[in-house]
Design a protein with these regions (language model features):
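Acidic, proline/glycine-enriched N-terminal capping motif
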Residues: 1-135
């Protein structure tokens, strides 16, 4: 099974991640997953790979040349948002909803890039076990 969904990137600004903001964002991520899958989830023993793309809003003061470099992937976003924190928040939000436990995640790929529309794209891929017991 493979599931891809998107959520707004509400954690993209320089800000403190308060427990309330994180709780609210986790709820939003869960809702987006459930909307996409109509409440299905991965098997409890299924190894999973998760791919997260965090699209941060381009700075307002960016010149047209800087914007072009950002769109073409030649300007790295080494500032905000904190990629590690967003990855952790997304994985924890989906625990118990998309999968039983985060220990099922065997591979995480996370990148961040610039965009006009800040958002977080999440793809989860599972390897369903065959009936003969082989992966």
């Amino acid at each position: 099974m493979k599931v891809t969904f998107t959520a707004p990137n509400k954690l993209a600004k320089k800000q403190t991640y308060t427990p309330d903001k994180i709780k609210e964002y986790k709820k939003l991520v869960r809702e987006r997953f459930l909307e996409e899958t109509q409440n299905s989830r991965f098997a409890e023993d299924e190894p999973l790979e998760i791919y997260i793309t965090v699209l941060a809003k381009m700075p307002k003061g960016a010149t047209p040349e800087e914007q072009a470099r950002m769109f073409n992937g030649r300007a790295n976003n080494a500032k905000t948002p904190d990629l590690n924190k967003i990855t952790k928040i997304v994985c924890e939000a989906l625990e118990g909803v998309a999968y039983k436990d985060t220990v099922q995640i065997t591979k995480v790929t996370a990148i961040k890039a610039w965009s006009v529309y800040p958002s977080v794209w999440v793809t989860i891929e599972g390897e369903e076990r065959k009936s003969d017991g082989h992966a």
